[in-house]
Amino acid sequence: MAAEADAYVALLLIHLHFPDAGSLKAKRKDLASVKAQLHGRMGVSVAEVGHQDLWQRATLAASMTGGSLRVLEGASDRVERFLLERFPESCRIERTLASFDEISG
């Protein structure tokens, strides 16, 4: 029998507004930069999950996993700070942290 392991997941739902985007192409360029930085610098898995056809809005789902709730909370805080610094007035973030046991029932 395998030993029990601590496993946690952080899920962030990120709502962004791009007031200066004049086209889908402009929004997608900005969004690609944000997604690349989150993934490359912070190891976050990111997907666009809403408002793909709107010029000035986007909703992203971001996730991270870890073996320590404290470490995962710190990583989530860093992601939020990065986004709020980049989009101080046009970003809203919802965060959920849970253990694997909570998710799997």
What residues fall within each predicted segment?
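Short amphipathic beta-strand and strand-loop transition segments with alternating hydrophobic
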Residues: 1-2, 97
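A short linear hydrophobic-aromatic micro-motif
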Residues: 43-49, 93
